[in-house]
From Swiss-Prot:
Residues 238-263, 314-353 are annotated as: Disordered. It comes from the Eukaryota. The gene is rmi1. Residues 238-255, 342-353 have a biased composition (Polar residues). This is RecQ-mediated genome instability protein 1. The lineage of its organism: Eukaryota, Metazoa, Chordata, Craniata, Vertebrata. Its main location: nucleus. Component of the RMI complex, containing at least TOP3A, RMI1 and RMI2.
């Protein structure tokens, strides 16, 4: 084999497919192809195609040839402007309930589960219609990062096998190490990696999301996948280098509605609530889950939630898919008063689907049985991954100080038992926690207490003040990324007692902790 022949193939891969490979692998691959052909003469075009086929079936970790910009997975805000090819290890549809997806794969789903004796509430015209969202775990063989289906991408589907090769076409916006992908940003080249078919099968990924035991038998793969081929001869060469093997990590679960479509409603339409809102029929059954709205949030708004601390953390904790949220109004027999405040979902639950890598070494050594003093907790900001890696849930109510943002608002803002009620999921980038926003916090954001609101809403002259306060509260919650004092009860659910800007001292403490963990 001549050196010129290898250079021709390398130039063809770069010019036609934007594929970059190490010369050692290319040399070994060409030698193996010629040995399989008994050293017979192979036309250059056919040789090019066979090398491409071998690359499509190769785990890029074996090549260890970086093509992505350095430390792009840690970038808070940047743009990937060039073209490059990466490998998709796994993908997950985070717009669908993980449990329902697992049932469909196992063939245990039942259509009767969707039948209810209670009349379902009709979606209102101004409510945003949710869309599909796929989260992709990507690698160039050296760096791991995620891709989010920011706009519908017809070329992608949940049946793509692990190891599929993708061509990324810039410019692509990158936020917090996540590629925000549109249809024009991605081309599916095909391929698969045999070793990853079982490790990252859909059933295993979903089991990890739900916190269920992983299935021991391999998932039955759909028809039409690329057939496995013999070893290209590069394995012996790659075995001499230190390789990083993929690790299957659990993904936090996201509970969503099943009937998603591809329509999108801009934020302006979503926020325009009609004047006769209160005249519309309301769903007064407090046991029913309120569907979350899936907004199309512009990139400028995403920039407002950038975390000022550069922290690499582990996968978050999981939500319980079977948990029922009983309102306190059930105890006293009163029905909650729903206020016209649509629930929002930041980034389409992007952060809830993230698989992160490194954990700051701040795990709790023990779990105290005594209640922590809130002032003492405020002195030391904590990470959710560290708290949840210790004794969790705590054996007694405890107050923690977290730098966090609101990932999802659960349900509608309402008045129940004379106080404001609103559920949410918060994240500090290392984990996720279901919380209730305290009445004091909501009253400060709205500008009126629940009792004052009841009175003012009956006064037509001042009703607009309440509506303005609620809209202000919504905007503040959407952009909120600050220090939160959170009280966690024995069930692991929290209450956000207060929120305040991060101080210089707290910022320095967290930066110091991250640097110590990296050393």
């Amino acid at each position: 084999m001549s050196v010129g022949e290898v250079q021709v193939i390398q130039a063809w891969l770069r010019s036609e497919w934007h594929i970059q490979v190490p010369p050692a692998w290319l040399d070994a691959c060409v030698n193996w192809i010629k040995e399989e052909a008994d050293r017979a003469s192979i036309p250059q075009s056919q040789l090019n195609q066979r090398v491409l086929e071998q690359w499509l079936l190769t785990d890029l970790r074996d090549l260890a040839h970086p093509v992505l910009p350095e430390r792009i997975s840690e970038a808070q805000k940047t743009v990937l402007s060039n073209r490059c090819c990466v490998q998709m290890d796994s993908l997950l549809d985070v717009s669908q309930p993980a449990y329902n997806q697992l049932q469909r794969i196992r063939g245990t789903d039942c259509s009767n589960d969707q039948v209810s004796a209670v009349t379902q509430e009709t979606q209102r015209p101004w409510e945003a219609k949710p869309t599909r969202m796929l989260m992709l775990q990507l690698t160039d063989g050296v760096q791991n990062l995620e891709g989010m289906e920011y706009r519908p991408i017809p070329a992608l589907n949940a049946n793509l096998p692990p190891g599929t090769k993708l061509q990324l076409v810039g410019p692509i916006a990158v936020r917090l190490g996540v590629l925000l992908l549109k249809a024009e940003n991605i081309k599916v080249l095909g391929g698969e990696v045999e070793q990853l078919l079982e490790i990252h099968s859909q059933s295993r990924v979903l089991c990890g999301t739900l916190g269920l035991p992983e299935e021991t038998h391999p998932q039955q793969e759909p028809d039409g996948l690329v057939a496995s081929v013999a070893d290209s001869g590069y394995s012996s060469l790659a075995s001499e280098a230190s390789l990083r093997h993929p690790q299957s990590q659990p993904l936090p679960q996201i509970s969503r509605q099943d009937d998603w479509d591809m329509d999108e409603i801009p934020d302006d339409d979503f926020r325009s609530i009609p004047d006769h809102f209160d005249d519309l029929p309301q769903n007064n059954n407090p046991l029913e889950d309120v569907p979350e709205d899936f907004d199309d949030i512009p990139l400028d708004e995403l920039d407002n939630v950038m975390c000022p601390i550069d922290v690499e953390v582990s996968a978050g904790t999981l939500e319980d898919p079977e948990r029922n949220k009983h309102d306190s109004s059930l105890l006293n027999g009163s029905k909650p008063e729903e206020v016209s405040f649509p629930s929002r979902s930041r980034l389409g639950n992007t952060y809830q689907s993230r698989t992160l890598n490194k954990v700051p070494n701040t795990s709790l050594a023990s779990c105290s049985t005594s209640t922590l003093d809130s002032s003492a907790c405020k002195e030391t900001p904590m990470y959710l991954c560290s708290l949840q890696a210790g004794c969790w849930p705590p054996k007694s109510p405890q107050v923690f100080r977290l730098q966090a943002f609101i990932v999802t608002l659960v349900g509608n803002l309402r008045i129940s038992g004379g106080v404001w009620k609103l559920g949410a999921t918060i994240s500090d980038g290392s984990g996720y926690l279901d919380v209730d926003l305290s009445d004091n916090m909501l009253s400060e954001l709205i500008g009126f207490s629940a009792a004052e609101t009841r009175v003012l809403r009956k006064d037509l002259a001042r009703r607009g003040e309440v509506d303005s306060g609620i809209q202000h509260c919504q905007r503040e919650l959407v952009d909120m990324c600050c220090m939160m004092s959170v009280q966690v009860d024995l069930t692991g659910r929290g209450v956000v007692l207060s929120a305040s800007p991060i101080s210089d001292r707290e910022c320095s403490e967290m930066q110091k902790r991250v640097k110590e963990a990296r050393r």
